[in-house]
From Swiss-Prot:
GO CC annotations on file: cytosol; nucleus
UniProt cofactor note: Binds 1 zinc ion per subunit.
GO MF entries: aminopeptidase activity; epoxide hydrolase activity; metallopeptidase activity; zinc ion binding
GO biological process, one term: proteolysis
Family of the protein in this entry: Belongs to the peptidase M1 family.
Reaction(s) catalysed by this chain's protein: an epoxide + H2O = an ethanediol
Keywords: Cytoplasm, Hydrolase, Metal-binding, Metalloprotease, Nucleus, Protease, Zinc
Cofactor: Zn(2+)
Pfam families xref list: Leuk-A4-hydro_C (PF09127), Peptidase_M1 (PF01433), Peptidase_M1_N (PF17900)
Name this polypeptide is given: Leucine aminopeptidase 2
UniProt keyword Cytoplasm, yes or no: yes
Binding site for a peptide: Q141, C142, Q143, P273, Y274, G275, G276, M277, E278
Amino acid sequence: MKMATPANPLRDPNTLSNYNKFRTVHTSVNFEIRFDQKRLVGNVIHRLKSLTNAESKEVILDSSYLEVKSVKVNGEAAEWQLLPRFEPYGSPLKISLEQAIPLDELIEVDISVNTTEKCTALQWLNPEQTSNGKHPYMFSQCQAIHARAIFPCQDTPDVKATFDFNLSSPLPVIASGVPVKQDASPPQSSGSIYYRFEQKVPIPSYLFAIASGDIAQAQIGPRSHVAVSPDRLDECKWELEGDTERFLQTIGNIIFPYVWGEYNVLILPPSFPYGGMENPVYTFATPSIISKDRQNVDVIAHEISHSWSGNLVTNCSWEHFWLNEGWTTYLERRIQAAIHGEPYRHFSAIIGWKHLVDSVERHGDTHEFTKLVVDLKGKDPDDAFSSVPYEKGFTFIFHLENLIGKDKFDKFIPHYFTRFRGKSLDSYEFKSCILDFFASDEESHVLLNKLDWDSWFYKPGLPPKPSFDTSLVDVVYELANKWKYISQSSFSPKASDMDGLVANQIVVFLEQVLLFDNPLTPEQSRFMGQVYNFAQSQNIEVSYLYLQVGLKAGDDSIVEPTIKLLGEIGRMKFVRPLYRTLEKFNRDIAVDTFEKHKNFYHPICRGLLEKDLFGDKGA
């Protein structure tokens, strides 16, 4: 029997901490949220366990752009220093211990710390950047390596700890823990109120999350609430209450029941750079999923799936990110299949394949970042962010399902998530796990051992394309083909062409139009927008593609709505392709638009847009 590869104690290259000497087991975060200073001020207390038998007299934690005031170890002042900054990983905090610590003994490290204006994990919004314009707002985004910019920590997904949060703010607070019911505390002299949260399931640092602003909540299921600006509460409640509990029950039947207690969704202001962030208990989500037609809630199916894949069973480093995102994309599509039927799973996978092709073309098919297992030594994991870990990861897991058969693979799924529950793993442990599980099934064992694992893990570019059920895309391809040859045919577009199509089918239609060797003329593009009502669509998944069709067609009338949209949404899925297309249309307009809106964007998004537009030198 093949044995699992032993874990390398330093298998995460994107941390400077000595987490092979000490391991965080619990963290208490105590912060005052100061909107006037755009700072978090307070302290963090780590309980650390010694992994060696008195071999180390120092604790090294990740930190980045922090103001450290003091450090105590077991209640006594300790010597400490911030080491020189090492890009892109920050300035390690070295804490000296008076004596080495015996194996398994615990120490308590208390660090007084403030965030600074250079913090890459927090975005502070002025009232005018929120939907109702009444109050300021702040939120965190710690994935991949930004928790170290909020407090010193072992900022690696290879370490998991329980958390408690003690936070004070003049505005309501959300955090990635279960709210602790408490007597209403009177406002402090500063006008702030205390909020407490507990996370009893151990989580990695990148799942630490806080937000504060003008936030109201409404129930969307028996264990779920939506939290959002009060002016958007009713529309968000309607958008999410139809599917959230159904998603939770569906995936619970595939793996095992949900373990986190509550599942809630925080709808953030529009500058949030991602579709969703799977922070435990409270998914942080983009307002772009609120399309007023319940057609964009696949994001919620994805984030709910992370409650098992990523949050409970975690990649040990960002080099193995596909273990988080490939599995989650696979599970999201299993939810879709259970609810909408198997053809819809294939339809979603066809859309995903297109995104994978786009990412590989953009990077180049020999690029390191098109591999399933990537080398991130000395690199910023944010730079590797693309659809590759999602869609190449999905394709691999889908291939495994088809290789050994769905019924057999379905028995492996709960085994895998039970085996690594609460743990972090790498790709080689995953391989060993599935080989071990099917060791007594001769047919499956032979197939899995014949599989070219090295090609799947390390070969750049596109993997073999699966055989998909195309029934839901064939009608769309046919319509796109009519538009492709519209000048040479009698085809007369009508609004009824869209009858019976869901939003994702319209997305595929527009993606096909964008692939035309000969773009539409400006007149044809405008006519498409009018007859199909794309120009007025409230669904951003549709409108951002239609704007690209117009820009490729050279339609000047599209420029103004493109600039407008780029100032209203900060989700990278939309703004990065739009800027690329706008730059090809008119680079000066693209650069001017970025300069106008750059302070609206989240620091992660802003940094990647600078690289897209100006190269590695930035603006």
